[in-house]
Amino acid sequence: MHKRCGMLLTLLLCCLLCLAARAEDAEDPVTLRALLVGCDEFLSHENIAPSAEMNVRRMANMLATDIREYAAIVSAGQGVGSVQALRELMQQTFAEADDNDISLVYFCTHGLYDRVTFQPLLVLSDGISEENLTADSLRDALDAVAGQKLLILDACNSGAFIGKGAWDAQLRNSFQSADYQVLTSAGARENSFLWRDRDGVGGGSYFAQELCEGLRSREFDYNADGQVTLAEAYQGLLESHGASTAQSYPQQSDFVLYAYDPDLADTAERPIGAITLDSAVLSEKEDTLYFSFTVRRAVRVQYQLIYYKNGLWRFDTPQTIEDPENETGALTPGRKERSVSLLAEEDEPYGYVLLQLVAQEGRRAMLAGSRLIAVQRDTGNPVLRIRCGESFDPAQGEELAVYVGHRFPCSLTVTVRDAQGQTVRRLAYKTPSRPLGLGSEASLFYWDGRNAAGELAAAGEYVIEASCTVDGQNYLVTSGTVRIGK
């Protein structure tokens, strides 16, 4: 009898705690606010108008479709000219934020490095004044905002702000904190690309367009639960955004980036969607790319193949193919299957290619989607090399960077094993490599210290294995010991 009474009291206490939590949430609901900054006109750098302002509009339109409803979406599409002006704008936008709120900040601008300290910078400019923003200054300004902060950086080298996208001892994560969620358009050594139409009235960044379209079309919602997490958005960008490599912190975050009602129609803007490759890997012998996509409304379509040469995407010399249905006027709505063949490359018949779908409606042309293809060698030893740190503390938000070098493009499997040789986590499984702007062929992976179930791995010793198969031959390399805990 006493045991039953004890259980009953425990259940009642749990119910009261749940009711108290719900009442507290009702009294202090989560409020979302956003500040969107786009810098187009510069004093000492190339102007990028109208791309940044168009990105700000695109982001604002996307956030306005989030069913959680933002209390404020402040757009600074004409830029911000100084760090002090940015601080004041943040204070005004997020003045009422409390510990229960979410504050989103988006930047589209130039990203570069200080020539003396080699620290990453964002360029603030309104066309009249200009000042560089360091990672520490940005962190300091955001620390003054209560609650959870979501930072989206759309700039060259933006991964450097979270220490990702390069193997460099000088890189550090300036936003390592439970208060921050960060998504960047590129790695620490990569350009982040913009596009503009011929008339100069349309444009934007590849990253912002893919992010907004992936959210609004719901293609990034892999489990179709009506919520797109940061981890899902990151995965979606890896698949749909090939010109640079998006980075995120935390690496596998369940933080909700976007929410929608599954019972309502999507709000996708593009005339083309659901682009699917039969395979993202081609070879020296198989040089024909097969893909399919859905036409949402009548449109003319052109395909461009952009080749990666000497560490650069050759946007200036695309291989252009007109869709055969253009001859009859336009592609009609429905599912389409297409194929294109790569140009023969005698000097180096392997590397990376970007497939771009360009849609034209009347006089308006727009980038309607892109996919990255790795052209891999049929034979040869990839000469795998692996590097990683000796220890890290995931309980403090630290992540382990894993560098895997390889002589040529290949598909990698990266596995974390414990001291008994058991698999703890797969960081990659037959994942095609991609260009990172590192100067030599290499891939980077990040372990957040969690196992396959999403739980923090126990303190102890681990190793990282990287492997790939070329011409039926398996190649394997193993790291030194990595320790979690003291």
Feature locations, PLM:
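Acidic, glycine-anchored loop motifs typical of Ca2+
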Residues: 222-230, 284, 288, 387-399, ...
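Glycine-centered tight-turn motifs at strand-turn-strand junctions
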Residues: 313-348, 423-457
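Cysteine endopeptidase catalytic domains of the caspase/legumain-like
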Residues: 21-279, 284, 297
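C-terminal tail/sorting-segment detector
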Residues: 355-403, 459-486
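Aromatic/hydrophobic beta-strand junction motif of beta-rich domains
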Residues: 289-295, 398-406, 447
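Short, glycine-anchored, charge-dense loop/turn motifs used at functional sites
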Residues: 309-310, 417-423, 462
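Extracellular Ig-like/FN3 beta-sandwich strand-entry sites
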Residues: 100, 298, 335, 348-354, ...
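Bacterial N-terminal signal peptides
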Residues: 9-18
